[in-house]
Amino acid sequence: MEQHHHQHTEAHLHHSNAVDGNVEVSATFQNGGLNLHVMDDEGLAPKLELTHEKLMHLIVVSNDLNEFYHLHPKQVSEHEYRVDVPLSNSSYTAFVDILPVGKNYHIKPIRINNLSEQNTFANLKKDNSLKKEVDGKMVELDISPLKVLEEITMKFQIKNAVPEPYLGALGHVVIIDQKVEQFLHVHPESENDTVFKTQFDEPGRYKLWAEFKFKGEVSVFPYVIEVE
């Protein structure tokens, strides 16, 4: 059963222009929440720059890709951030989006394996229809040919509602491959439409979650696509 959870914000993938230093993030699940430890290559806590009003943007998915959480941990100490999340006895992967000041950082999958010894990954089946109804809203995905290393255009046609600005954009999209290793976080080409562009480095099946805000609430529309 699909589960989608979110908080109201949006995030981009960030790549610092700095060339010095690396930052690593680790995660553990404890007492009903995720603890995230952030440390640079000198063993120090890097200063994080606000990105879209938050210091940290966190995507958590179950490894079978049936659960999706969009969260924003709070800083609780110099190195530590924490957020409550209702994870079950399953295996999960986290992707942490931050912008350390003066340091390089690359988003990597963080396995959260202390919940379950089993590590069951998704066996995705390509959607036959790209029309999805969630919370009474109908959204159709019109996507250009899915060719690896080529620019892909995704147009989301919202049939029976008008999306609201979602911190400067009309939505955002998270894309993860079925091995839960590749991560894309995409936002519209302009503030006035729901057209997104991206590129895939590897062929295969991917799950896509599109988030749109209607009347103050965010709805999540899941799709499975295949890149050749």
Where in the sequence are the language-model features?
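Intrinsically disordered, low-complexity terminal tails/loops enriched in metal-binding residues
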Residues: 1-228
